[in-house]
Amino acid sequence: MPLEMEPKMSKLAFGCQRSSTSDDDSGCALEEYAWVPPGLRPEQIQLYFACLPEEKVPYVNSPGEKHRIKQLLYQLPPHDNEVRYCQSLSEEEKKELQVFSAQRKKEALGRGTIKLLSRAVMHAVCEQCGLKINGGEVAVFASRAGPGVCWHPSCFVCFTCNELLVDLIYFYQDGKIHCGRHHAELLKPRCSACDEIIFADECTEAEGRHWHMKHFCCLECETVLGGQRYIMKDGRPFCCGCFESLYAEYCETCGEHIGVDHAQMTYDGQHWHATEACFSCAQCKASLLGCPFLPKQGQIYCSKTCSLGEDVHASDSSDSAFQSARSRDSRRSVRMGKSSRSADQCRQSLLLSPALNYKFPGLSGNADDTLSRKLDDLSLSRQGTSFASEEFWKGRVEQETPEDPEEWADHEDYMTQLLLKFGDKSLFQPQPNEMDIRASEHWISDNMVKSKTELKQNNQSLASKKYQSDMYWAQSQDGLGDSAYGSHPGPASSRRLQELELDHGASGYNHDETQWYEDSLECLSDLKPEQSVRDSMDSLALSNITGASVDGENKPRPSLYSLQNFEEMETEDCEKMSNMGTLNSSMLHRSAESLKSLSSELCPEKILPEEKPVHLPVLRRSKSQSRPQQVKFSDDVIDNGNYDIEIRQPPMSERTRRRVYNFEERGSRSHHHRRRRSRKSRSDNALNLVTERKYSPKDRLRLYTPDNYEKFIQNKSAREIQAYIQNADLYGQYAHATSDYGLQNPGMNRFLGLYGEDDDSWCSSSSSSSDSEEEGYFLGQPIPQPRPQRFAYYTDDLSSPPSALPTPQFGQRTTKSKKKKGHKGKNCIIS
């Protein structure tokens, strides 16, 4: 009996265990999980939770439990169902809420059912993912969706937010299952501020969301923003004032708030106003809007040059090139002769060209442009129009004499050392012999006749020619070389160098017209390589300013001009002139030796009669050139140009003031004795040589038109032309001593009629000019005016200011003397 009862007892015990609610694994499941699906056996519960992500399984005191609570509040907002959870509903709105909640529950609310599919079910498909659900697996069914519709446990999610439906609670709408939140939003808008359903008739819609009218306000000051401007920050609205005070960025340039009304530029966490003033180069202040820029150390620059802190535009202040101190490294590099082609060209253009058109500033594109900017443009124009082929000049190897190492080392003055050490070494070349001179005269005369038509073709107007280089400015900044870093002389220094040239300048007058064009800056790009004229003064002045040798690619080319040049170029257009209003002749051919050698070759036996010096009015400077400039060299250095000439220095009492010279005593001497005189008197030769011969009206120069002169050249042999040159009366033997200024003057014949008639003369330096064309002062004293009944100033008759380029070279001799303060210019105003 006991043996028979054992299986029955065990079966009863098993049945009781299965039917007991406390022992049916449900007790264990309730203790392990915060929530379990109702009506499931323990193994079915295990199968269900096994289908869910581990972090979403609601174990007790687990992240899954916290996630469940969060989802309950989110998916089933209590204020969507209960009036007590709402903040400020009117009575009407409360009734609407109750009706709304009851209707949703009645029409859409449901709970999903977990079922274990029988193995006979072969065609169950998940409604969400569309995959097959095999027999023996658990599936979720929704009664509102229909009996045959099922989902994988992990696919039973809200159609809108794609989150697992917490506790399997769903709302069915239009064939889709939703959580309680998104189902309510399908029916009524939800306020983004209070998260409640909006039952009022009016609401504010912004940013794709809805607000109660009174809830759409600034998050900071709670100002109602309905119908006003606002700014959204992290999904919250702000009024413009609060946003600027809390979140507005500061401009890196001006330091002010970037207002909501202003566009801004942002780069690497930095902000700028999107204006030309703020978003600009930190160095040159050029606007960078729409342009590439170079960021460096929190600043933005337009180019590499500006990022290095250098000013591309030279300063226009007085003597800026000499007042700016150089670093030791730059001095060392200068002494090593480092130089670039573009830098040398830029510096030379600065030395050669004055300020543009002081009488007609309207011709300039921008009247506020600095002088150095325009000078750089001119140098770029030379470079852009192929002034001279590099191979052409490199092929012309010139002999250079070795420098004397002791000459420059004996002086402590830095500028003097640079002048002596890096001066043009070709200056000491011997004078060309007579055969070379005659051959070159014939060659140049033929060449000038051939090139006359070419010059006419290339003769553009002043505005189009002089300013055509502006287009190259932005592209050529990096090509300026040393000149971009401030080592080139400023315009004030250029004026001073022109005054140094002036000291040795002859003041003979050329009655040509084309000489204006040949000597002007505009002609540089038109000249052929064989016509290109370079003065060794360029090298001397470059050495004074930069200390850089210009012997390499910028070697001076000797070029000989005969009188045919001056006579041939008579009737050309005088449109192109610069504004240098003084006799700015070069030092090149002004020594007594070169004049003597020239005169001995052209007219070997003729001795000039002694005549009284002529008294010529001088061109006067403009107001812009009236500031006195001074280059200080060592007072103890005087280079007499390798000639055994006795140099006398004036006493100390006479060095600080300008002196008055009388030329009558010098007019009574033969020019063969002038070699003994000082540097000052040597520059006076040009004045005296022109005046030592008196001409009758019948002996004056016959003027040829271009057509007549070409016929004359064709009909004459070389010797007849040479004889004609020697008999050219106005210039005589000393054509090469004439000034660089050809004067086109309707009153020239009146002047020639009075040639050499005055007895008294006086000379005054014109380094500082008058304040106007009518009266002038120097050092507080009025400059005496020429008698108006005799002749008029030439500048009154000029169509435009005269040019200021050096004369063509004759040999390579020049004088590198350092001028004393008392021996400034020798431009003479003679009454």
Swiss-Prot record:
Modified residues (Phosphoserine): 315, 591, 594, 683
Annotated segments matching region Disordered: 313-342, 663-688, 763-831
All residue ranges annotated as the LIM zinc-binding domain in the record: 124-189, 189-249, 249-313
GO terms for cellular component: cell trailing edge; cytosol; glutamatergic synapse; nuclear membrane; nucleus; postsynaptic density; proteasome complex
Superkingdom, taxonomy of origin: Eukaryota
UniProt-listed SMART domains: LIM
One GO molecular-function entry: protein-containing complex binding
Propeptide feature ranges: 829-831
Location of the protein in the cell: Nucleus membrane; Cytoplasm, Cytosol
Consequence the record notes for mutating residue 121 to I: Probable risk factor for NTD
Spans through the membrane: none
Residue numbers bearing the Cysteine methyl ester modification: 828
Tissues in which the protein is found: Expressed at highest levels in placenta and at lower levels in lung, liver, kidney and pancreas. Expressed in thalamus, hippocampus, cerebral cortex, and cerebellum (in neurons rather than glia).
One of the GO BP terms on file: polarized secretion of basement membrane proteins in epithelium
Gene3D superfamilies on file: Cysteine Rich Protein (2.10.110.10)
Function, in words: Involved in the planar cell polarity pathway that controls convergent extension during gastrulation and neural tube closure. Convergent extension is a complex morphogenetic process during which cells elongate, move mediolaterally, and intercalate between neighboring cells, leading to convergence toward the mediolateral axis and extension along the anteroposterior axis. Necessary for nuclear localization of REST. May serve as nuclear receptor.
Name listed for the protein in its UniProt record: Prickle-like protein 1
Organism for this UniProt entry: Homo sapiens (Human)
